[in-house]
């Protein structure tokens, strides 16, 4: 909600060129206002509404007091005043919303823009994460392939071993290699990014726990 | 003058009512209504049948009690000026208790709306809630209710000037506008994108507007009874406590709508 009309004149022409567009960047009170401040800001923005409300209630109590006295003419006058005061309040409200329409529309667009920005940022982060994972996976495959080739060369150089025992020994060594390699051997490309197991541990949170991620991003709003 | 004869004349302005079963009857019905209502809200088997019985009992007791009051006031002439003042006091106590009831509802609303918790996204209306646009159907409803205030004021004016037709037509117009208002509220409820179970917003919205709707229905019945009493020549240009009470109640309901419209529909969306 815009604070007052003075924001209308100083609106920047290119909203998207600003890092985080908001009319209230220099107005910390807007983000931190408490309940009482919120109410008083509303009342200051549209002072005719509370005035109309007070007049309406006053006319209503006046009608009751006249009724207690048995003064039907005064009751009638107060009823008319009540309807008039309420009509005034409603008209003031409609006029106020019309007066602030541009301000409020702008504010709504700013909110939307910021929300979009947050979403885009989150998407980019996720894409980066996937790319890192992909690179890690490729590196792993490459190393395995290299090892397999090296072993095949070694074996061919030493002369193919024959017999069932030798084949079993080879298969065992192969399996052992596969088991031990992923965790320890692969050096991460980026020190900030975790290795494969780390990513897998986080995976459920990334996919299922989007709530927490949403909450934290929205808190900043 | 013997005591027996004197007992037929009340040489004081007050109305000492004859023994009546309705206060006790109503008390029993009210206790049953709250007990069975609370139990049925906690899913006790078949208790809602007792709830409906208690409700029917309460409505019948009210009907018969009000019938007695009408016969005492209109046909027995017991409602002297002092009694009328007492009835007026009863009306204002009723309206004050209603006002405090709505104060509690507004308190609940402002408690949630002014400092929205982090679960709501720290904003009001909460994240994911699409509130009703206040300048569509609610504005029309506001105008309808305000017009009904004007028509009932016209009916009152006509009555105190002794114009029977104006009083009748004004009341009929008011009741029609009230029914249209209630119908539009029903439309708004049926097309709203949220329900009463949608967090603090849905709860406060339907809690406040729903109870206001119930009060509109009660006020409509109040004015319909008054309309029938005008039609049946019960009310005169200077003795119409029931009608004036009904009008005051109607204005009260309208004022509550103004506050609802400003805080829940306009500032709260």
From Swiss-Prot, chain A:
InterPro entries: Hypoxia_induced_domain, RCF1. The keyword Transit peptide does not apply. Residues 9-23, 157-173 have a biased composition (Low complexity). PROSITE patterns: HIG1. GO terms for cellular component: mitochondrial membrane; mitochondrion. Residues 1-29, 144-221 are annotated as: Disordered. It comes from the Eukaryota. The keyword Coiled coil applies. Keywords: Coiled coil, Membrane, Mitochondrion, Transmembrane, Transmembrane helix. Residues 112-151 form a coiled coil. It is a multi-pass membrane protein. One of its GO terms (biological process) is mitochondrial respirasome assembly. Its main location: mitochondrion. It is found in: Mitochondrion membrane. The chain crosses the membrane at residues 46-68, 83-102. Associates with the respiratory chain complex III/complex IV supercomplex. Belongs to the RCF1 family. Cytochrome c oxidase subunit which plays a role in assembly of respiratory supercomplexes. This is Respiratory supercomplex factor 1, mitochondrial.
Swiss-Prot record, chain B:
Its EC number is 7.1.1.9. GO terms for biological process: mitochondrial electron transport, cytochrome c to oxygen. Its main location: mitochondrion. It is a multi-pass membrane protein. Residues 42-48, 115-137, 189-201, 266-269 are mitochondrial intermembrane. Residues 1-22, 74-80, 162-164, 231-248 are mitochondrial matrix. GO terms for molecular function: cytochrome-c oxidase activity; ubiquinone binding. SUPFAM superfamilies: Cytochrome c oxidase subunit III-like. It catalyses: 4 Fe(II)-[cytochrome c] + O2 + 8 H(+)(in) = 4 Fe(III)-[cytochrome c] + 2 H2O + 4 H(+)(out). This is Cytochrome c oxidase subunit 3. It comes from Neurospora crassa (strain ATCC 24698 / 74-OR23-1A / CBS 708.71 / DSM 1257 / FGSC 987).
């Amino acid at each position: 909600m815009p604070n007052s009309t003075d924001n209308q004149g100083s609106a920047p022409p290119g909203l998207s060129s600003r890092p985080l567009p908001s009319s209230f960047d220099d107005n910390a009170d807007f983000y931190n206002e408490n309940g009482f401040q919120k109410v008083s800001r509303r009342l200051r923005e549209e002072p005719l509404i509370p005035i109309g409300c007070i007049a309406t209630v006053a006319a209503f109590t006046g009608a009751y007091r006249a009724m207690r006295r048995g003064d039907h003419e005064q009751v009638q006058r107060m009823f008319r005043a009540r309807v008039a005061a309420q009509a005034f309040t409603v008209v003031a409200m409609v006029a106020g919303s019309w007066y602030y329409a541009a301000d409020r529309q702008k504010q709504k667009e700013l909110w939307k823009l910021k929300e979009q920005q947050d979403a885009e940022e989150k998407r980019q982060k996720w894409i980066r994460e996937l790319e890192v994972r992909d690179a890690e996976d490729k590196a792993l495959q490459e190393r395995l392939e290299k090892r397999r080739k090296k072993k095949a060369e070694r074996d061919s150089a030493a002369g193919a071993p024959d017999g069932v025992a030798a084949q079993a020994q080879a298969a065992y060594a192969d399996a052992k290699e596969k088991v031990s390699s992923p965790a320890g051997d692969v050096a991460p490309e980026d020190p900030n990014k975790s290795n494969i197991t780390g990513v897998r541990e986080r995976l459920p949170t990334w996919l299922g726990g989007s709530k927490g991620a949403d909450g934290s991003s929205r808190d900043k709003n | 003058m013997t005591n027996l004869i004197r007992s037929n004349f009340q040489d004081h302005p007050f109305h000492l009512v004859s023994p009546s079963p309705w206060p006790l009857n109503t008390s029993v019905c009210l206790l049953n209504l709250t007990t069975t209502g609370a139990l049925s809200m906690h899913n006790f088997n078949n208790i809602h049948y007792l709830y409906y019985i208690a409700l029917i009992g309460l409505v019948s007791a009210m009907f018969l009690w009000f019938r007695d009051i009408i016969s005492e006031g209109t046909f027995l002439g017991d409602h002297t000026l002092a009694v009328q003042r007492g009835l007026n006091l009863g009306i204002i106590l009723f309206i004050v208790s209603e006002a405090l009831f709505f104060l509690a509802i507004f308190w609940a609303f402002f408690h949630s709306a002014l400092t929205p918790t982090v679960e709501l996204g720290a904003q009001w209306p909460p994240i994911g809630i699409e509130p009703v646009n206040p300048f569509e159907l609610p504005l029309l409803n506001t105008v309808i209710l305000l017009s009904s205030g004007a028509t009932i004021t016209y009916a009152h004016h006509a009555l105190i000037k002794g114009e029977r037709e104006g009083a009748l037509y004004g009341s009929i117009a008011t009741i029609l506008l009230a029914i249209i208002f209630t119908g539009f509220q029903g439309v708004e409820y049926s097309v709203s994108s949220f329900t009463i179970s949608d967090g603090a917003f849905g709860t406060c919205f339907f809690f406040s507007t729903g109870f206001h709707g119930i009060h509109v229905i009660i006020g409509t019945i109040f004015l319909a009874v008054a309309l029938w009493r005008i039609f049946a020549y019960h009310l005169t240009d200077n003795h119409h406590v029931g009608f004036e009470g009904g009008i005051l109640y109607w204005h009260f309901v309208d004022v509550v709508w103004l506050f609802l419209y400003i805080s829940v529909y306009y500032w709260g969306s």
